């Protein structure tokens, strides 16, 4: 959240944050402390609604549990209908594994939120979770074109459920032309797809 606000502010966007939790470290560490702010989320929504707040965009990120996703959905239903753009970063896992703190029910609720989004930005693991795909089917693919074709099809499958655009982040592959390991993001919008990448 702190990193995102800095970037948004530098772009001239006034952010109105709603923290979902305070963590001593990110969830990739074995030991961290998490203070959930679930009980505060509805109070934020009610306060903004009473103020007749209008947002140009809503950007969701880390949620500590499925109850928080329920609050995110309620907030999106309140303000998204007022033409606010909805971007969902469905934080659930990485490198083929779901983060241990998240349940199957959590992932189901995240699918529900993702369906409401204008843009959803999963990494490859999260894309597999959202589309109920076995990550192992993809992880050993070495052919760049085949890998990107499969990822694009999964993104299209997700788009059929609701989001207009799917941006799959952190895709690692070996470039067929120069043999160099690269990492990139694949944006899929309708019949268009754009891959941006750089050397690892």
Describe the predicted segments one by one:
Residues 1-100:
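Conserved N-terminal subdomain of the carbohydrate kinase-like
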Residues 11-14, 26, 43, 68, ...:
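Residue-identity detector for glutamine
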Residues 24, 95, 174-175, 194:
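Flexible, glycine-rich phosphate/dinucleotide-binding loops
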Residues 193-200:
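Short pre-catalytic strand/loop immediately N-terminal to key active-site residues, enriched for Gly-Thr
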């Amino acid at each position: 959240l702190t990193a995102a606000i800095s970037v948004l502010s530098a772009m001239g966007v006034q952010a109105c944050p709603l923290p979902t939790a305070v963590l001593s470290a990110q969830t990739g560490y074995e030991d961290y402390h998490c203070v959930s702010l679930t009980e505060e989320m509805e109070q934020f929504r009610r306060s903004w609604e009473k103020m007749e707040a209008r947002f140009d965009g809503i950007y969701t990120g880390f949620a500590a549990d499925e109850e928080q996703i329920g609050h995110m959905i309620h907030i999106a239903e309140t303000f998204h209908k007022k033409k606010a753009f909805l971007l969902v970063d469905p934080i659930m896992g990485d490198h083929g594994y779901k983060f241990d703190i998240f349940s199957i029910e959590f992932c189901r609720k995240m699918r529900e939120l993702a369906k409401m989004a204008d843009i959803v930005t999963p990494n490859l693991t999260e894309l597999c979770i959202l589309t109920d795909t076995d990550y192992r089917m993809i992880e050993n693919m070495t052919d760049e074109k085949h890998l990107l074709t499969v990822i694009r099809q999964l993104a299209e499958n997700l788009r059929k459920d609701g989001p207009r655009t799917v941006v799959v982040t952190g895709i690692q592959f070996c470039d067929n032309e120069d043999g160099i390991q690269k990492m990139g993001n694949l944006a899929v919008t309708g019949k268009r797809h754009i891959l941006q990448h750089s050397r690892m």
